[in-house]
Amino acid sequence: MGQKINPLGFRLGTTQSHRSFWFAQPKNYSKGLQEDEKIRDCIKNYVQKHMRISSGFEGIARIDIKKRIDLIQVIIHIGFANMLIEGRARGIEELQTNVQKSFHSVNRRLNIAIARVPRPYGQPNILAEYIALQLKNRVSFRKAMKKAIELAEQADAKGIQVQIAGRLNGNEIARVEWIREGRVPLQTIRVKIDHCSYPVRTIYGVLGIKIWIFLDEE
């Protein structure tokens, strides 16, 4: 059987950079990792509760975390203008307070910044979220996949592969379906490939969505 390496980890240091940037002693490493997960979960939960946009999903592309001794800098990359964007400083302050409460750090300040992603549908997380929303609304999985590919092509992606696994359309037997458009050269390290794995809960059970997008060649 073919062993599939994660395309993001495979390209770290060439076309991909770390989503968390900090240094720690080996004994404190796990604590720092858990803290990062807590921050990301807290932000996603807050956005889901308070800041739904018209299309029905929050549209977070990724969350980068940089840590210093006295400061935690969090950069939220979002695809669509919502309450967190310019002119809504109160929303950011409220989110900052909410996250600060969740991990009780007295010595370090938390600073949250927002960055806008120019082509949202070129981001696999946003595309996966779009497909998840369609599947929850009982749209056919093939239709959802084709629409996601159209959106990625409009965002100038050179290639895209979408895979959905689980009880598709409510079938008794789980299976894996995938569709590819354009080139997705997973073995070439110099090409910039973005990837995400996204679980979605439907009335038939949990489905797994995986997306690979070929963005650019270095």
From Swiss-Prot:
Signal peptide: none annotated. One of its GO terms (biological process) is translation. This is Small ribosomal subunit protein uS3c. Keywords: Chloroplast, Plastid, Ribonucleoprotein, Ribosomal protein, RNA-binding, rRNA-binding. The lineage of its organism: Eukaryota, Viridiplantae, Streptophyta, Embryophyta, Tracheophyta. HAMAP family: Ribosomal_uS3_B (MF_01309_B). The keyword DNA-binding does not apply. Its main location: plastid. Belongs to the universal ribosomal protein uS3 family. The gene is rps3. Part of the 30S ribosomal subunit.
